[in-house]
């Protein structure tokens, strides 16, 4: 004989299940009406700008992730230099992209190749859909991520000041030009090319610069030695695997902002 408590419990679970199924069907039935509804211009401006800020904060965590990953993979003697290099890189990229990189990217004539070398100003209005300042913040984090790709490739191959010089050129010229070609409405955009979250503008651009760097700089000092007339690779012990693990999780966390907020809008039901 089935205990009475089990019978009552089964009835309760059945009611709960039916309740949640009803809620799901109600949401599905009303989703079309929600999708068609529109928010006011002021509401869209607020939520889109907030989206840029939240996404930018998440991507900023990637800077810490790159730093931890890079610090953990290099030899112990280079850890302090890597930390200083990553902090300096973040500051340099932010300043240079503010001074003229943003205008080079977004000041491109339609179908053109390069924007203007001038300091930008936030002239956004409610009708534009978002604040230019929030977009600058979000895009600046992308610049820092791009330069971080190169930073990891040339770790222990380059001194800190030459790298800072490269960071100025990368964040103020190379990256903004490639960004303007597509996201700024340049010739690639006019040709129909699309890059949703930086697979070309960020990763291919950063990867090409990193490849050029390691070809020019060569291997890390002491990485190879001669033995019996042959070139033998010397294994380098990583300074800290826990740092590598921490960096991996920080990058994983930051990527939700990097890719997710590349929608560039959260002012409508469809965007969200």
Stretch-by-stretch model annotation:
Residues 14-272:
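Hydrophobic alpha-helical transmembrane bundles of multi-pass membrane proteins
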Residues 1-12:
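Short, Lys/Arg-enriched N-terminal segments with co-localized hydrophobic residues
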């Amino acid at each position: 004989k089935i205990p009475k408590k089990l019978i009552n419990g089964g009835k309760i679970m059945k009611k709960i299940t039916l309740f949640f199924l009803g809620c799901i069907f109600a949401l599905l039935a009303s989703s079309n009406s929600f999708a068609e509804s529109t928010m006011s211009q002021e509401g869209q401006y607020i939520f889109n700008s907030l989206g840029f800020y939240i996404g930018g904060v998440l991507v900023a965590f990637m800077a810490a992730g790159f730093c931890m990953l890079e610090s953990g993979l290099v030899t112990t003697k280079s850890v302090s230099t890597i930390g200083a290099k990553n902090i300096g890189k973040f500051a340099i990229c932010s300043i240079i992209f503010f001074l003229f990189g943003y205008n080079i990217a977004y000041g491109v004539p339609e179908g053109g190749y390069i924007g203007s070398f001038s300091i930008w100003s936030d002239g956004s209005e409610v009708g534009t859909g978002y604040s230019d300042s929030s977009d600058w913040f979000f895009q600046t984090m992308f610049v820092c991520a791009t330069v971080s790709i190169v930073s990891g490739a040339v770790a222990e191959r380059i001194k800190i000041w030459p790298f800072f010089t490269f960071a100025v050129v990368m964040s103020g010229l190379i990256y903004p030009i490639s960004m303007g070609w597509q996201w700024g409405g340049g010739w690639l955009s006019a040709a129909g090319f699309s890059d949703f979250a930086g697979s070309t503008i960020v990763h291919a651009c950063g990867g090409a610069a990193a490849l050029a760097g390691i070809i020019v700089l060569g291997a890390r000092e002491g990485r190879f030695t001669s033995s019996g007339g042959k070139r033998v690779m010397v294994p380098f012990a990583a300074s800290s695997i826990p740092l590598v693990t921490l960096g991996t999780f920080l990058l994983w966390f930051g990527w939700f902002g990097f890719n997710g907020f590349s929608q560039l809008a959260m002012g409508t039901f469809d965007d969200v």
